[in-house]
Amino acid sequence: MQNITQSWFVQGMIKATTDAWLKGWDERNGGNLTLRLDDADIAPYHDNFHAQPRYIPLSQPMPLLANTPFIVTGSGKFFRNVQLDPAANLGVVKVDSDGAGYHILWGLTHEAVPTSELPAHFLSHCERIKATNGKDRVIMHCHATNLIALTYVLENDTAVFTRQLWEGSTECLVVFPDGVGILPWMVPGTDEIGQATAQEMQKHSLVLWPFHGVFGSGPTLDEAFGLIDTAEKSAEVLVKIYSMGGMKQTITREELIALGERFGVTPLASALAL
């Protein structure tokens, strides 16, 4: 019998959650991570599944995700503990045939349930599936320190925030030319913040929750993690710049245009126009 804890997706979740905790992005039970799988990914591990999988209804049906398996982090679980006990802190779930709920096939032992931000994740998965023709498979939420700090001092406007991050590090425009979506402050763990996040995910692979954290999307765990890591690095540079009195020179609009042309990306027009 193959052990699901040795599968590429469980091992990938262990690495991503451990790395995020080591970065300081996921204190206590902060942060959550979901990865969309295929039936072929989980097929070799049926012998590991719960004999009687628990069923949990969704707060709203999501027919686009019908019959789709995911691996998810658990509610109230600490990222630092995923590596110690994957089955207690992670779960493989599968949405039912009409998208009205899901079964917990593996993990989330001791009656644990998926992250409270599952509505935001599933709604964002729906939008990224449509926006990327199914390419994006990962939604990651974390409390990236410097990105949060900037939401207190920068105007919380997509164009302004995006332009500052692009200027903070040359690679940013190449990595997220679609810019950073920004919500108003909202209560977490609700359908309302999930819907607002998903709406921004139609246009952006990164979405900031001011004074709280960031959502990132990507085709793989590495890509989603790297996207947030790149934005957070630029935010760290900007925090240092502002603490030293501000910019005396920066990457110009013309240079940003040249950068986009060199790497074949189309920068967010509103940010480029500033």
Swiss-Prot record:
The UniProt keyword set, sorted, is: Cytoplasm, Lyase, Metal-binding, Rhamnose metabolism, Zinc
State the reactions this protein catalyses: L-rhamnulose 1-phosphate = (S)-lactaldehyde + dihydroxyacetone phosphate
Q: Where is the signal peptide?
A: none
Q: Report the active site residues.
A: E117
Sample GO molecular function, one term: rhamnulose-1-phosphate aldolase activity
* GO CC list: cytosol
An example of a Pfam family matching this protein is Aldolase_II
Q: Detail which positions bind Zn(2+).
A: H141, H143, H212
The cofactor note from the UniProt entry for this protein is: Binds 1 zinc ion per subunit.
Q: Which domain of life is it from?
A: Bacteria
Localization (cell)? Cytoplasm
* Subunit and partners: Homotetramer.
- Known function: Catalyzes the reversible cleavage of L-rhamnulose-1-phosphate to dihydroxyacetone phosphate (DHAP) and L-lactaldehyde.
Q: What is this protein called?
A: Rhamnulose-1-phosphate aldolase
Q: Which gene encodes it?
A: rhaD
